[in-house]
Every structure is written in C-alpha cells, then in structure tokens.
Amino acid sequence: TDVARYRAGDLDMTNYALPPEQFAKLQKELPGEVFTTRTLATYSYELNNKKAPFDNVNVRKALNLSLDRNVITDKVLGQGQTPTYVFTPTYIEEGQLIQQPAYSKEPMAQRNEEAIKLLEEAGYSKANPLKFSILYNTNENHKKVAIAAASMWKANTKGLIDVKLENQEWKTYIDSRRAGRYDAARAGWNADYNQATTFGNYFLSNSSNNTAKY
C-alpha cells in the first residue's frame, strides 16, 4: 500500500486517499507529515428524476432532509471533508453568493419529522416503505458512505425507507448512469476551473454529465 511504501521511503508523497480507519492514527504517528488540502470538489448522490418515485419532488426533499451529512464527513470519512447542502463549493470564485438551504440549520430531529411527513403524504409506510438502490462504482470508501446513508435513511425515517446497495465496475457504472439504469447513484464533480459555473454547467439540460436529467 501507499502507507507501507511511504514508511519504507519508496514514496515522498501520495495523493491517494488514506484508509479512513488509519487517518487519525497516522496523524499521531507521523505528525506534520499527514495532512489534507481543500479541493474544489463535491461528493454527492444523484436521483433519477425521470423515474418514479424520484419524479416526486417531495420524495427527493425527504431524502435530503433525513441524510445527516455531518455523520458522513466526521465519522465515516473523517479526513477533513466539509458537510454541505449545495453542489457548488462556497469557497470557489463567486461560490460565496450561494446560500445553504434553511433546513441545513434545523436540528436533525425536526428534519426527520418533516421527512417522515413528506413520505407519508407520498403514500409510504412501514408496511409499504420507499424502496430503491444506490449504485456506486466499486470502491471501499464509496461502499462505506452508501452503507451509512442507507442506515441513516432507514433509522431517521423510522423504517419508511429501505435501501439496497449495488456496485459496478467503473465502465459499467458510467454506462448505467448514462442510460438511466439506476435509482440513486454516487456522483460528484471536480472543478475544471476556479469559478462557480464549472459546477452549474453540470446541470445544463444538454450536458452529458446531467445523467439525473435535470
């Protein structure tokens, strides 16, 4: 691994993500040598807006409300990632003009109550939960995030959401997204340049990256 090669002196530095479970330990063992830098990138899940039930905006809102980003950034990943509720980083040029939604400041208990209400209004119950799959490309960190998200959605909505995980190798995963063969999928974007439109262009109706069909 890169960690072993670095310790042996074969590597001077690496830009590969360290295993989350080793990060804090390595920071203590190698003070001043293990650190992360902020990048113009966002990790997200996209929902297939052309496919039921995600053609219902209230279902999409319920998922947004009941996902605790802080758990993912602080406990699952734990390498300095910042929780956000918008796609464009606020520290990119002109990104400071973008406002986080009001619900991001609400207590999780309140957000969960709102999510449950929206799901019940959409016809879901413990006997008839919202069922869907999260598609992600094969990677241990993606798997850990997906497991955490699935668990939170189920717990925070008191069983109104039931999520399964589906992993595919990179090429198949990309093909599935482009063809719309998914419910929810791991997504994200790395900036091409230091200006907010590099993230906004992702959602243009004629963009090949707009696989969620906004």
Task: State what each model feature region is.
Residues 1, 112, 116-191:
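Ligand/substrate-recognition segments at binding pockets and active sites
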Residues 16, 76, 103-106, 132-140:
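Short beta-strand->loop
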Residues 1-51, 74:
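Extracellular/periplasmic solute-recognition and catalytic clefts
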Residues 7, 11, 28-31, 52, ...:
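Sec-exported extracytoplasmic/periplasmic mature domains
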Residues 73-74, 106-109, 160-173, 178, ...:
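Extracytoplasmic/peripheral linker and loop segments enriched in polar/acidic and small residues
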Residues 81-121, 139-144:
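Structural transition elements
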Residues 15-22, 69, 88, 169, ...:
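Beta->alpha turn/N-cap motifs
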Residues 23-36, 181, 195-212:
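Ligand-binding "clamshell"
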